[in-house]
Amino acid sequence: MIRLSILDQSLIGEGETAADTLQHTVKLAQMAEECGYHRFWVAEHHNNDEIAGSAPEVLLGYLAASTRKIRLASGGVMLQHYSSYKVAEQFHLLSALAPGRIDLGVGKAPGGFQLSTDALQAEYKKPVRQFDEKLEELTHFVRDDFPDTHRYAALRPRPQVDRKPGIFLLGGSTESAISAAKLGISFVFAYFINGEEEVLKEARRAFDAHLPPGSEAEFHLAPAVFAAHTKEEAEKHIVSRESIKVVLKDGRKVNVGSREQAEAYLENVTEPYDIIVQKTGIIAGTKEEVAEELTRLSGTYKINDFVIFTPIKNAVEKQLSYQLLSDAVLAAKR
């Protein structure tokens, strides 16, 4: 059975303030709960005039108080900027406030360009620790299972909770899928960034191949979805069918979105780089057409959980898209 969740970045609409947008996010979470969506994800972006969602760990607390039962998740915390212990404590606290409803999604990206990254990491020693090392440490903190000889074996995130947050890694590559699988944590493939089905196919295979025996970790897919009463109405929301990735000489990879955003990012880059153009995973059409494509992806890649990303700034049109999708896929569950 297909299960749907929502990823909301809190995109600021025409003529809106950031405060207006955040209230739209709250209302969208409430609608998602009523329509039968399983989980509501909120994102982290920095120094972006078009996005209000900069602190998911704060927004989740407000959403937990504004809803009753829907699961809530960060999509995701940009772990490279933070102490893994502090992140674990934040999500343990959220889990104490909303038991069984909180999940911790983390991302490898910076969530912004170099200026915001420099500000967020100003107190860090250089070079910053490798992401995989921090992710493994975070996983041990949340699970409370450091080896006895580890320097943090006696350190526990407070408050202690009976129902710990689930951990997810968000990414768009086979490499990230393998990193998640080896740790036995769930993986969300960012299809809305990398819509190459060959990459999806290989990431799915690699995730299964590297998962420890008995692990309950899952592989989720996050497509961009636009549903409307007609295919033409849905497709008017598509700004581009490609995304740009910048690969720096030191191995860092930054998804920058559009060509215009790539140009802005590269203004502050002094080292050699390569640019990779990726097809985005966009599904647009009537509710029946969208449901048909989700069913195809589910059957082809054995995926039951979809994280639906609908980057429409107009709150009414965005909500309509999610309502139509729920009518086509989730109505029988309500």
UniProtKB/Swiss-Prot annotation:
One of the Pfam families matching this protein, by short name: Bac_luciferase
Catalytic activity: N-acetyl-S-benzyl-L-cysteine + FMNH2 + O2 = (R)-N-acetyl-S-benzyl-L-cysteine sulfoxide + FMN + H2O + H(+); N-acetyl-S-methyl-L-cysteine + FMNH2 + O2 = (R)-N-acetyl-S-methyl-L-cysteine sulfoxide + FMN + H2O + H(+)
GO molecular function, one term: monooxygenase activity
Disulfide bond entries: none
Gene3D superfamilies in UniProt: Luciferase-like domain
Entry EC no(s): 1.14.14.-
Pathway: Amino-acid metabolism
Gene Ontology, cellular component aspect: cytosol
UniProt-listed InterPro entries: Bact_Lucif_Oxidored (IPR050766), CmoO-like (IPR019949), Luciferase-like_dom (IPR011251), Luciferase-like_sf (IPR036661)
Entry keyword set: Flavoprotein, FMN, Monooxygenase, Oxidoreductase
Stretches that traverse the bilayer: none
PANTHER family: LUCIFERASE-LIKE MONOOXYGENASE, N-ACETYL-S-ALKYLCYSTEINE MONOOXYGENASE
Function: Involved in a cysteine salvage pathway from S-alkylcysteine. Catalyzes the oxidation of N-acetyl-S-benzyl-L-cysteine and N-acetyl-S-methyl-L-cysteine to (R)-N-acetyl-S-benzyl-L-cysteine sulfoxide and (R)-N-acetyl-S-methyl-L-cysteine sulfoxide, respectively. This pathway is likely important in the catabolism of alkylated cysteine generated by proteolysis of alkylated glutathione formed in the detoxification of a wide range of electrophiles.
Similarity comment text for this entry: To bacterial alkanal monooxygenase alpha and beta chains.
Name this protein carries in UniProt: N-acetyl-S-alkylcysteine monooxygenase
Organism: Bacillus subtilis (strain 168)
